[in-house]
């Protein structure tokens, strides 16, 4: 069972798309990621970009923990359906879903906009494609 582990939506259950295309991040891993972020940078009031969002669990966790706004980017229709349900469950008004490939989103993303980025790309994504996206991503990050 995937759930929000901390913050205002703590304990709310999330749906995960059926099939093998989405690999939900475990509660333990999410807890470690956010504990590290919070200790080092803080999450309160930040803008977060979640690429390859899957179920949206990572971005929604950020929203629950106080992120100002979150953009979830996911191209798969079944994953987007799960994300929409999870957005309703969490109820954060400033979480948006961009139903497109990460590379497409990054091409038109605003410059100097995001404080934090979460990216959990599929295993089969080629290294060169990831490198190109990272270069494009740099432009969207605040210093």
Which residues are covered by each model-predicted region?
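Class I S-adenosyl-L-methionine-dependent methyltransferase catalytic core
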Residues: 1-143
């Amino acid at each position: 069972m995937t759930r929000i582990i901390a913050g205002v939506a703590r304990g709310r259950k999330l749906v995960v798309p059926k099939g093998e295309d989405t690999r939900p991040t475990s509660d333990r891993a999410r807890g470690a990621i956010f504990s590290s972020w919070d200790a080092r940078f803080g999450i309160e009031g930040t803008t977060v970009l979640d690429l390859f969002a899957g179920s949206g669990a990572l971005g929604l966790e950020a929203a629950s923990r106080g992120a100002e706004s979150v953009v979830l980017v996911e191209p798969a229709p079944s994953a987007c359906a799960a994300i929409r349900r999870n957005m309703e469950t969490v109820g954060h008004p400033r979480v948006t879903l961009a139903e497109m490939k990460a590379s497409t989103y990054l091409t038109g993303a605003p410059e100097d906009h995001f404080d934090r980025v979460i990216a959990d790309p599929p295993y089969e994504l080629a290294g060169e494609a990831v490198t190109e996206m990272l270069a494009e991503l740099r432009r969207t990050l605040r210093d």
